[in-house]
């Protein structure tokens, strides 16, 4: 006996919420590509793809504009609902930066002193992070350059990171008028120990890709420099030893007297991302050969721990970040945006603290005293 008497509808549904209207090719934009899966021999696998979501704003270190945030949301929803997609690769254009976070030109010129507007922007930002964390495909962050500030936050929202060894990682908020409450204060204590998480969060010091590998924040680090056909590991970073004179040195900067020679060596090299792409493709192929539903259930089980504190704090953080646009963000983002005019990208912190200690009003008079003056 068959069950052909039961009603069935076998026409495939389209679960994509958004079309392609948010994607583009001219910077600033987000490029969305559906690239065929290839096996280890380079053969194309019919009918299966990896979605590449590519930040495209290289002249501003791939910082995301408001419209780019919308496009990232659209990209992850599209990839998540595409039954032919095996995995998502989240990356960026160029060799300098994966992402440095929000666009400070927008932040300073438009959003500062407009807290309601920034609150609405944060609704989009939170939706972008949620889109990454909720994507029903494994998400690989292919780090082609620096991943700092909000770029570090959206990068840590992904499932696994494979990075160029020229990349640096870190936060910038406390130095430039904000707090990394777009994910870093939630994710860092999971991904690093509490001491490292605290220091990395508040020091605003960039850490090398190798240091982050040693700290287990990234999955794999690959060289991208080549000289005479041979791979050259980042000469600005110690990879020759783990301990030197009792100090942990792996992933730390080389000594000051070695920097000049390191930069000279880098100038003789070419940049080649083929090894990075091979590592990404190897991971995508690994995913291809796993049960898809068992894979995503396993991933969502791990993600749930990352999401726990993110979901607890994202709304309260949204409101604080909005209000802060009337406060220290106004100073910090404008100082950073005006650095070509003033020659300085931060405020006079000592003067600011002195004014705070005096109980000074937070007004334009205060701002004039702590912001650098335009160069003559």
Each PLM stretch: what is its role?
Residues 1-49, 95, 208-210, 225-376:
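C-terminal alpha-helix plus adjacent terminal tail
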Residues 7, 13, 17-22, 92-128, ...:
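Glycine- (often His-adjacent) and acidic-residue-rich active-site loop
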Residues 7, 69-73, 77-80, 104-144, ...:
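An acidic, glycine-rich surface segment that forms the CoA-thioester-binding/catalytic face
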Residues 46-56, 70-113, 130-141, 160, ...:
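A structural preference for short, pocket-lining loop segments at secondary-structure junctions
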Residues 59, 95-96, 186, 198:
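Glycine-centered loop/turn positions within well-structured domains
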Residues 61-64:
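Short amphipathic alpha-helices within nucleic acid-binding modules
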Residues 124-128, 184-187, 196, 297, ...:
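Hydrophobic alpha-helical segments typical of transmembrane helices
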Residues 131-292:
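Crotonase-fold acyl-CoA enzyme core
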């Amino acid at each position: 006996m068959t069950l052909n008497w039961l009603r069935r509808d076998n026409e495939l549904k389209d679960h994509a919420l958004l079309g392609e209207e948010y994607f583009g090719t001219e910077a600033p934009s987000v490029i969305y590509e559906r690239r065929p899966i290839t096996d280890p021999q380079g053969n194309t696998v019919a009918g299966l793809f990896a979605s590449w979501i590519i930040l495209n704003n290289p002249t501003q270190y791939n910082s995301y504009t408001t419209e780019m945030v919308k496009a990232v949301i659209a990209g992850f929803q599209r990839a998540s609902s595409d039954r032919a997609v095996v995995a998502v690769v989240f990356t960026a254009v160029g060799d300098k930066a994966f992402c440095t976070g929000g666009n400070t030109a927008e932040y300073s010129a438009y959003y500062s002193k407009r807290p309601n507007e920034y609150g609405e922007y944060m609704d989009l930002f939170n939706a972008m992070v949620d889109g990454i964390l909720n994507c029903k495909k494994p998400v690989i962050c292919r780090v082609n350059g620096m991943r700092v500030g909000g770029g570090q936050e959206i990068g840590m929202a992904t499932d696994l990171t494979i990075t160029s060894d020229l990349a640096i990682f870190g936060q910038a908020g406390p130095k430039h008028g904000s707090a990394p409450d777009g994910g870093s204060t939630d994710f860092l204590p999971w991904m690093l120990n509490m001491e490292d998480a605290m220091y990395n969060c508040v020091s605003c010091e960039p850490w090398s890709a190798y240091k982050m590998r040693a700290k287990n924040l990234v999955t794999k680090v690959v060289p991208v420099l080549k000289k005479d056909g041979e791979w050259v590991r980042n000469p600005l970073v110690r990879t020759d030893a783990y301990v030197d004179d009792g100090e942990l040195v792996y992933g730390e900067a080389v000594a000051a007297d070695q920097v000049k020679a390191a930069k000279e060596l880098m100038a003789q090299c070419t940049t080649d991302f083929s090894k990075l792409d091979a590592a990404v493709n190897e991971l995508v192929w690994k995913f291809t050969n796993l049960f898809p539903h068992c894979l995503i259930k396993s991933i969502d089980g791990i993600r749930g721990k990352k999401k726990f504190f993110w979901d607890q704090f994202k709304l309260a953080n949204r409101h604080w970040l909005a209000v802060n646009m009337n406060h220290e963000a106004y100073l910090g983002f404008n100082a950073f945006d005006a650095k070509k005019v003033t020659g300085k990208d931060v405020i006079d912190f000592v003067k600011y603290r002195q004014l705070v200690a005096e109980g000074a009003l937070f007004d334009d008079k205060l701002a004039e005293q702590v912001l650098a003056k335009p160069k003559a």
